[in-house]
């Protein structure tokens, strides 16, 4: 009985989290010219970091060294996260002549 309740609660939390993420993803309407071609991603590296006695933090490993420790002000435990910013405005328009010329011919 205890396992069924725990499983039910986990599924309910995942459903609520999924709905929350979907709603948050639809927050932009695409009218903002500057945000249209920008993407900021955050991924959990699968580990946590802790503050040592000397005040330093344990190293975050994984994701080819792109993981960093993020923590709240007075907490002793943080999350190892990998962040990446991509600005697609640096790339040419997919319909430009340069892209069409570089496309393979049939």
From Swiss-Prot:
Glycans are attached at residues 48, 54, 64. Residues 1-24 form the signal peptide. The keyword Secreted applies. GO terms for cellular component: extracellular region. It is found in: Secreted. Disulfide bonds join 45-67, 49-69, 60-80. GO terms for molecular function: C-X-C chemokine binding. It comes from the Eukaryota. The keyword ATP-binding does not apply. Keywords: Disulfide bond, Glycoprotein, Secreted, Signal. Salivary chemokine-binding protein which binds to host chemokines CXCL1, CXCL2 and CXCL8. This is Evasin P1168. It comes from Ixodes ricinus.
